[in-house]
Amino acid sequence: MTWDVFLSTKALKQKDKLSKDLKFVLFLLVEDLKHKGGNPGNQWPNYKKFKGLKGQRKNDDWRHCHLQKGNPTYVCCWKVFEDTQRIEVYYVGTHENAPY
């Protein structure tokens, strides 16, 4: 069964600012999320679940991975909703401006 993956309005605007290569990497990540759910696998660099972030409730499932290493490093952050099998990508951009 596939998951519903959508980008927030903010993430859509951020995606438009990415280079062509980064847009393709984001596309590959979204495809992995659709088919594998919130855990796209260890092949994604620095993939981790967030715990204890400001504003995060105990049952919130927030995750991230790096899209491109180097300077600047680009990351993608998403929320997983297991009960409805939905994933919301809420940030795509540089590590320096990431909401964590």
What do these predicted ranges mean?
Residues 1-73, 81-100:
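Basic, Lys/Arg-enriched alpha-helical interface segments
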